[in-house]
Amino acid sequence: MVTIRLSRGGSKKRPFYQIVVADSRSPRDGRFIERVGFFNPLASGNVERVRINLDRVNHWIGNGASLSDRVASLVKEAQKAA
C-alpha cells in the first residue's frame, strides 16, 4: 500500500521533514517513490514552514494512496492557505 508520510532529516534536536510518497513497508527514512514537499517544525520569522505540491498529493490520493495523520493535517492547512 502506498502512503504519503514524513521522512525525517536535519540534525540532532533540529528536525526537518520531507513529505514523501512511499510504500508502507519501507523504512521511515528509506526508499520513497516521490518527494512532494517539506515541513519545518522549527521555522520562525520569515522562514517557510511548509510547502506541499497539492497537485501531486491529489494525484496520489486519486491513485489510492493514504495519508498519515500528521500529513493529513498539513495538507488541510496548506489547502486553507492556498
Curated annotation (Swiss-Prot):
Q: Name one Pfam family in it.
A: Ribosomal_S16
Extract the InterPro entries matched here. Ribosomal_bS16, Ribosomal_bS16_dom_sf
Q: Which residues form a coiled coil?
A: none
Q: Which GO terms describe its cellular component?
A: cytoplasm; small ribosomal subunit
Q: Which UniProt keywords apply?
A: Ribonucleoprotein, Ribosomal protein
Q: Name one GO molecular function term.
A: structural constituent of ribosome
Q: Which GO terms describe its biological process?
A: translation
Keyword Ribosomal protein: yes or no? yes
PANTHER family noted in UniProt: 30S RIBOSOMAL PROTEIN S16 (PTHR12919), SMALL RIBOSOMAL SUBUNIT PROTEIN BS16M (PTHR12919:SF20)
Matching HAMAP family, A to Z? Ribosomal_bS16 (MF_00385)
Report the sequence similarity comment from the record.
Answer: Belongs to the bacterial ribosomal protein bS16 family.
Q: What is this protein called?
A: Small ribosomal subunit protein bS16
Source organism (scientific name): Histophilus somni (strain 129Pt)
Q: What is the lineage of its organism?
A: Bacteria, Pseudomonadati, Pseudomonadota, Gammaproteobacteria, Pasteurellales
This chain is encoded by the gene named rpsP
